[in-house]
Amino acid sequence: IGTSPSVGVLVMPAIYQAVKQHAPQLLIRNVPVTDPETQLAQFQTDLIIDGNSFTARALGHNVLYTDTLALVCRQAHPALSAPLTPENLRHYEHATFMSEGQGQDPLRQRIDELFPDRPISFSSYNMFTLAALIGSSDLLCIMPVRLFTLLQKCWPLESIPLSQLTTESIEISLHYNKLSLRDPVLENVINVIRQTF
């Protein structure tokens, strides 16, 4: 099952428990996602759980859950003592999460429209690196709420309540090669994962 580290930490514990209950003989491997469409099309991995959408017709997907977004800063950040408007928040540098091999996605475009002139001074493919940096600087970052809830247990992070983000969300989906459904074991695993979420 391919995931990024930040998605894996949120979904793999529940998947492991559910799969072990239904198919205890299976070895579950969590592998990195490098080129999701190729990995699935060439059967390099059976499943990928990701927030991206793919266009290949040979691939199927099921939405596992939808997560809202939060604007995150360190505790006692100076922005928390000023009116929380996009204009005031543009004065602070932002960090951004980037997925490998991902082009311009609609969610990123909407965030860019919300903060059109935000200065981005750091980007990383690793949410844990971003959280550590945000917790020790004045950077701001937009991230999924479930991930923020987990990361704030490790770093001194706080969510900035911003009404403009309340309608934005990200879908985390299970992706697979449709031909994989011919394998009854894999089809069962896919069904177990769907039911878990």
Language-model regions, residue ranges each:
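Short, well-ordered beta-strand segments
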Residues: 1-2, 48, 72, 95, ...
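Central regulatory/effector-binding core of bacterial HTH transcription factors
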Residues: 1-55
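Secondary-structure junction motif
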Residues: 10, 79, 84-86, 93-115, ...
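A late-sequence structural motif
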Residues: 11, 86, 158-197
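A local structural motif
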Residues: 21-29, 112-122
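Short helices/loops that flank or line small-molecule/ion binding pockets
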Residues: 34-45, 87, 127-138
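Flexible hinge/capping segments at coil-to-helix
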Residues: 56-98
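Beta-alpha-beta core module
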Residues: 57-62, 67, 128-178
